């Protein structure tokens, strides 16, 4: 059974502290130093303890040791680099491939300027941002799936 501290709401000093709102917790105590020095370290140390505990109790296998004398048939990057790898693999000019990769973040940076007059949060009322998101997602998935396939089937995904 735990003891909980109930605030005395009839106290005018406490009511004044609670009326201030931000910077105070439920009991009217200021966030500094109570919350920052006593609660946050417990949460941070608890998170670290859970992470270390999971790492000790369930260690994952690193994999087979590397052999410098055996090269795999096709070298594939990590899964999150598949779309970029596919761009570099399919574009004949490597400079054009690098420029296409640089065009992706540059294009994403222009979207807010194309639709700066639209202040709606509903995606159906923001057609430019929704269209850019949907086309970008489809292209990224298409390039990512194609990168895992052989080069002759990578652009058509083996469907045609």
Curated annotation (Swiss-Prot):
InterPro entries tied to this protein: Cyt_b/b6_C, Cyt_b/b6_C_sf, Cyt_b6/f_cplx_suIV, Cytochrome_b_C_euk/bac
Disulfide bond residue pairs: none
Primary subcellular site in the record, as a coarse category: plastid
Gene3D superfamilies the record matches: plastocyanin oxidoreductase, Single helix bin
GO molecular function: electron transporter, transferring electrons within cytochrome b6/f complex of photosystem II activity; electron transporter, transferring electrons within the cyclic electron transport pathway of photosynthesis activity; oxidoreductase activity
GO CC annotation: chloroplast thylakoid membrane
Subcellular location(s) of the protein: Plastid, Chloroplast thylakoid membrane
Entries under PROSITE patterns matching the protein: CYTB_CTER
Membrane topology: Multi-pass membrane protein
Key words, A-Z: Chloroplast, Electron transport, Membrane, Photosynthesis, Plastid, Thylakoid, Transmembrane, Transmembrane helix, Transport
Record-annotated membrane-spanning stretches: 36-56, 95-115, 131-151
Keyword Iron tagged: no
Pfam families: Cytochrom_B_C
Any one of the GO BP annotations: photosynthetic electron transport chain
Record's subunit section: The 4 large subunits of the cytochrome b6-f complex are cytochrome b6, subunit IV (17 kDa polypeptide, petD), cytochrome f and the Rieske protein, while the 4 small subunits are petG, petL, petM and petN. The complex functions as a dimer.
PANTHER family for this protein: CYTOCHROME B
Function of the protein: Component of the cytochrome b6-f complex, which mediates electron transfer between photosystem II (PSII) and photosystem I (PSI), cyclic electron flow around PSI, and state transitions.
Xref: HAMAP family: Cytb6_f_subIV
Protein family (similarity comment): Belongs to the cytochrome b family. PetD subfamily.
Name of the molecule in the record: Cytochrome b6-f complex subunit 4
Source organism per UniProt: Marchantia polymorpha (Common liverwort)
